[in-house]
Amino acid sequence: MTSNKLKFSYFQLTFGQEEAYLHPEKTYQRLKKYGYDAIEITPPKGRYGLGVKLEDYLETHRQLKSDFGLEVSCINECWGEEWDPFSPDYKTLTESKTADLAVSETKSSVDFAAEVGAPLVTVAVAIHEDIGKDRVKECTEVAVDALQRMADYAKSKNVNLVLEATNHLEMGKFINTVFNHKRLIKYTRRDNIGIQLDWFHANFEELNPYEAVMDAHPLLWHMHFRDSNSLTPGYGNVDFKAVLRAVKKIGYNGYCTIESAPMIPDSDTAARVGIEYLRILESIVDYQLSPEFPNGYALKM
């Protein structure tokens, strides 16, 4: 168990592409104002970027990091065209051709992470077609091979990968739970692949948020704090107090990245309320886990 204070980050892309790629300084100003430690960014690729060049984006964030004293918590690998299965650039982990595209795309994000000083790159477990019992072995083998290639390249750059556990409605039925993510990671036999829990997705798939954290340990390296309705924490029904009790008990030292889509009621409010809400919960949880709870004093001999 740890009493270390949580580290907070924000997923920049949810502020919209215009801000993320054309005016990223607005995000840094906002996060610095409200006491964030870091920013999570998505490199300009595919349908993301509004024409901004990757090299220019890298230099911009290097300068903004220095100017505002924020870290980059993670590079969120959105794979550009992953939401359009009819695109020739569609990328998945479960079919050989599309997995090759995913490996190539992830390698470029690993390069970006190494250059900007981010410790992690997110990999989403996208699938192309429905997977049933008759295809699960084949698809698992393709996914393991792709992840091994990604992980080996990432290791050469001193970067770790995190698999985001996603809900079956968005990414299909394959490995939607923490348990199955751990199983897939075990098959890879690589020590630089962990788990990213997104509480919007987990709310669909996990039986209990406390158990999900405990089950993910010690591979829980990154988290997205998005509520059950995809809004800033506090606007839905995810039991974030239970989440924080669990992360304190396992000694979690990764970032808590807040996310909201859409921004309700606006970007400033979403960023401010999200961190204020979680800090209040953290103070409650710290006391609940202290020896002075609930009487106001600890037993002594």
Positions of predicted regions on the chain:
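Structural detector of well-ordered beta-strand residues that form the stable sheet scaffold
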Residues: 9, 73, 121-122, 162, ...
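A structural motif
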Residues: 36, 118, 220, 252-253
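Substrate-binding cleft of secreted/luminal carbohydrate-active enzymes
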Residues: 254-257, 290
